[in-house]
């Protein structure tokens, strides 16, 4: 798979071309470990699908205002190893934020990132980081269009529950920076959500 030939929707050089391997590139940060276990992958996937079903069934009471309306076209996500590989390459740069070009041959790819830190020698489990994205639902106004909501406050939530997204793959790295124990999680989603002229899902 030659990532250097992929032309991303948003331009730029593909992450898997630019960095080319899973070797961590973290400067003076001390890398403790990287990658997700099979169990962690299953947990992340289950957390996404449980939350998508909660939304679909109209059980999410939070919002600005809540509750969130039920969905009629919400499907379960499946894990995709290629998305996970590209997410892991980006996580291994230890740069908090979004990369520019992560699309794969079959579709454009969206992304959620989360970073937590502790002065104690411990790291939050990935599901806790995923729940931080879910919590953004408290700022979502379902009475407005997606494009009229404040994207900076709700973009992780909306990608999680974007109905047309079918697949997910994530990467993770744990490192120490200035005595802070940090856990950085990157999840890539395909096809990408958060297209301004579309809605999250069809309401019932």
UniProtKB/Swiss-Prot annotation:
Q: One GO cellular component from the entry?
A: extracellular region
Q: According to its UniProt record, in which tissues is this protein expressed?
A: Expressed by the venom gland.
SCP domain boundaries: 45-189
Which Cys-Cys disulphide bridges does the record give?
Answer: 4-17, 8-101, 26-94, 170-187
Where in the cell?
Secreted
Q: Which keywords does this chain's UniProt record carry?
A: Allergen, Disulfide bond, Secreted
Q: Which InterPro entries match?
A: Allrgn_V5/Tpx1_CS, CAP_dom, CAP_sf, CRISP-related, V5_allergen-like
Pfam families under this entry?
A: CAP
Family per similarity comment: Belongs to the CRISP family. Venom allergen 5-like subfamily.
Q: What is this protein called?
A: Venom allergen 5
Give the source species: Vespula pensylvanica (Western yellow jacket)
């Amino acid at each position: 798979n030659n990532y250097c030939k992929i032309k991303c929707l948003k331009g730029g050089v593909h992450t898997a071309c630019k960095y080319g391997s899973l070797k961590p590139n973290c400067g003076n940060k001390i890398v403790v470990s990287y990658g997700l276990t099979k169990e962690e992958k299953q947990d992340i996937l289950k957390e996404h699908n449980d939350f998508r079903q909660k939304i679909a069934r109209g059980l999410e009471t939070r919002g600005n205002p809540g509750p969130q309306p039920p969905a009629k076209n919400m499907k379960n996500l499946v894990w995709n190893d290629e998305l996970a590989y590209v997410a892991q390459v980006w996580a291994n740069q230890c740069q908090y934020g979004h990369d520019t070009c992560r699309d794969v041959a079959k579709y454009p790819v969206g992304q959620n990132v989360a970073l937590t830190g502790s002065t104690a020698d411990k790291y939050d489990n990935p599901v806790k980081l995923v729940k931080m994205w879910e919590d953004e639902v408290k700022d979502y106004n379902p009475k407005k269009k997606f494009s009229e909501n404040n994207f900076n406050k709700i973009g992780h939530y909306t990608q999680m529950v974007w109905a047309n997204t079918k697949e997910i793959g994530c990467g993770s790295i744990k490192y120490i920076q200035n005595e802070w124990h940090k856990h950085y999680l990157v999840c890539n989603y395909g096809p990408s959500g958060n297209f301004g002229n579309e809605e999250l899902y069809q309401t019932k």
